[in-house]
A protein has these predicted regions:
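A compositional/biophysical signature of low hydrophobicity enriched in polar/charged and small residues
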Residues: 1-130
């Protein structure tokens, strides 16, 4: 354990921010308490993997508030999206909008029944040795 007083600690934090180790600060909100009852993972297959088409899809997703995370994958699926919605009807409207997006060949969705683990941080204990 490192004991630092406020000024040295703040300098260390500022250095970590400047070097890009700390990317930002966020509050961890409970989606259900805020009325987002539905969490869904959507696997998206595109009709083209040309760079311009991949970027166009990413730009489309950035403008969609129900999409909380978007990951480009290797293998059978081009992208996986983590989405939240207040109800299934709202999510279904989004899926209709998503399937009509340029270059989207098909979308498969999986409704989350239960979250067994959520870890927002990286496992520093596996990398850091003091």
């Amino acid at each position: 354990m490192v004991r630092l007083f406020a000024p040295p600690c703040l300098r260390r934090v500022r250095t970590l921010e400047e070097e890009g180790y700390i990317q930002g600060y966020r509050g961890l909100l409970d989606p259900q308490r805020l009325g987002f009852e539905v969490t869904v993972f959507a696997s998206v297959h595109l009709s083209s993997q040309a760079d311009a088409d991949l970027r166009a899809f990413e730009d489309f997703v950035r403008g969609e508030p129900l999409v909380r995370e978007c990951w480009m994958l290797s293998g059978d699926v081009d992208f996986i999206l983590k989405c939240v919605a207040p109800d299934m009807a709202t999510f279904q409207e989004f899926v209709s909008h998503l399937t009509a997006a340029p270059h989207v060949r098909n979308v498969r969705t999986s409704l989350v029944l239960h979250n067994s683990k959520y870890a927002a941080a990286v496992p520093l204990e596996l990398k850091v040795s003091d």
